[in-house]
Amino acid sequence: VNAEIQAAILERLTGGIAANLELNVLWKGVNGTTGQFDGFGTIIDANANGNVNFVATPVALTVDNIISKVDALIAAMPIAVKSATEKPIIYMNQLTWELFMRAQIAAGNGWYANLGPAMAGLKYMGLYEIAVCPGIANNTMYMARKSNLWFGTWLTNQMNEIFILDMKENDGSQNVRYGATFYAGAQIGLTSEIAAYGPGLS
């Protein structure tokens, strides 16, 4: 297999791994499931009786209530965290983001309807960035500083490997086989500096 084909295969493989981690593992992964680790959402949701600042009595999110529920999430975050130099970020999935956009349009904030991709980098109330994360469950939002959400791997371990096996020398075919093994995990720094809305709703 020539170098260009190998590079294309590796790009596709690593892209697929990253997409799967983002969609299925990083937020909602469960350590007991093969190929997964406890995601940020799983760790936060398990802290229901601990220090996480949960919004009381969450309900399903709609166009009519999304703005007030985002405000409730912000209100649940300790003022010391909101006052820090590094501002917390609001995390939600695509469906929740679309509800938020539609609510802004209905409220007459037409720039939400027209900017499209240029919305990236804009902040709610001029303070809080909204990050759209496909792995977060419906009716669920989190608020945290980026530095409080940790993703780690073990770069020096020999188990971290991506390989391509040219089958021509083994069976005469023009096929290739490829795979990857790696370590990864997610962790929360301070649960008391996390606000959450609606874990468990779907």
Language-model features: where?
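Helix N-cap / beta->alpha transition motif
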Residues: 1, 91-96, 144-145, 189-192
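Short glycine-rich, low-complexity/disordered patches
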Residues: 23-31, 82-88, 114-117
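Short secondary-structure junctions and interdomain/linker hinges
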Residues: 20, 24, 73, 77-84, ...
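Sequence/fold signature of self-assembling virion shell proteins
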Residues: 38-65, 101-202
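Alpha-helical scaffold segments that mediate packing/assembly in large oligomeric complexes
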Residues: 1-75, 197-202
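Extracellular structured ligand-interaction cores
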Residues: 8-10, 85-87, 175
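Ordered core of a single globular domain
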Residues: 68-105
